[in-house]
Amino acid sequence: MDDEISRALEANRNFYAALERRNIGEMEECWSHGDDIACTHPGWHRLDGWDEISRSWRAIFANSRAWRVRCEGERALVSGDLAVIFCLEKLEAVGAQGEPARMQATNVFRKESEAWKMVHHHASPMPDVEASEEEDTVN
């Protein structure tokens, strides 16, 4: 099982490498190409199926500046042919001033022909820590 966790984590790192390089060919390699997959980019509605997801990555890559992407705090769970990875994304435009954007992400991979392929990606902004500490979210 440790070997499968390592392979799933490698697939996750390949996804973030493709994202950082804004390389659509590498991104295509990371994903399953079925109709049963989904992606939710920060601030977007859910996209279903490879056609929609592929179009979204092409638009994002065409309309964005070069950036650095770091994936931190990876936690992986593997069960059968599914792997779930939780992580923190830090995205920073090259040459930009200020703090990088911080996203919390959940990535789900399915084993297809001995390779881990992404079937779900969901990223959303991290909550403001100071504001969330002031709120009483548990009653």
What are these regions (language model features)?
Residues 2-29, 36-139:
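A beta-strand edge to alpha-helix "cap/lid" segment located at domain peripheries
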